[in-house]
């Protein structure tokens, strides 16, 4: 039997979706299908062709096509969902939730129809609630529907720590628990630089400031851009997760997954440390938490639940 490349579909060809597609192609993780709505079919095809024409220069082998027809995504191994609207000025979070939930339901229906055996990674915000929506709508087992936020939040945390210590980001490890928002829980106790606990290297007030900046990391970029939100780091985070699955790397990465009793919570999607490999979420890693950390996680969970209440 002929060996075939993996097929990865990216739903939503905006800044994040297009950047994700480009990174996945550069990493040669598979052939890429970039999908958007019919009104945007030509720009989507244009972006895909532009990326493809960079392949001789950058030296990667991957086919990249743009489309508005989900039939082109048939038999995808992995589907990444970035589609959805961004929150506009004056728009309530509830409005954002209901609009994006409708989009998730439509997208999921098409994905399941054409790629019933795929793994789905969700980026659309509010990501905890949207991951839950896709999980319920797809009927897929929980290991195959994964939300991305922790890799991004941890990347921001690691960036700020590396800047503070003036060291390589490669030497900084960290973990962020909970929902993707102001109540996320960066676990400083489980964070290191070159194997040394951060608490031994950075004064508490500076560490607290880094935690606070991490929580507000998305907002900081929104404010600086003035229009739109972050897309380079979110796309890089998605690419890292896709690579872990495609190459069966069994990486320890924070991911949003469906909890069934872990950390004392049940029936909800929340960011926790996981092992991510060829079978999607292979395992949830349960860390021992202090009372303060438990309280912070409970607060984060409440924020997620408040969003979930809006779901139809």
UniProtKB/Swiss-Prot annotation:
NAD(+) binds at residues 12-17, 36, 100, 123-125. Disulfide bonds: none annotated. It catalyses: (S)-malate + NAD(+) = oxaloacetate + NADH + H(+). GO terms for molecular function: L-lactate dehydrogenase activity; L-malate dehydrogenase (NAD+) activity. Its EC number is 1.1.1.37. It comes from the Bacteria. InterPro entries: L-lactate/malate_DH, Lactate/malate_DH_C, Lactate/malate_DH_N, Lactate_DH/Glyco_Ohase_4_C, Malate_DH_type3, NAD(P)-bd_dom_sf. Pfam families: Ldh_1_C, Ldh_1_N. The modification Phosphoserine is found at residue 149. Substrate binds at residues 87, 93, 125, 156. CDD domains: LDH-like_MDH (cd01339). The active site is at 180 (proton acceptor). The keyword Oxidoreductase applies. One of its GO terms (biological process) is lactate metabolic process. Keywords: NAD, Oxidoreductase, Phosphoprotein, Tricarboxylic acid cycle. Catalyzes the reversible oxidation of malate to oxaloacetate. Belongs to the LDH/MDH superfamily. MDH type 3 family. NCBIfam families: MalateDH_bact, PRK06223.1. PANTHER family: L-2-HYDROXYCARBOXYLATE DEHYDROGENASE (NAD(P)(+)) (PTHR43128), L-LACTATE DEHYDROGENASE (PTHR43128:SF16). This is Malate dehydrogenase.
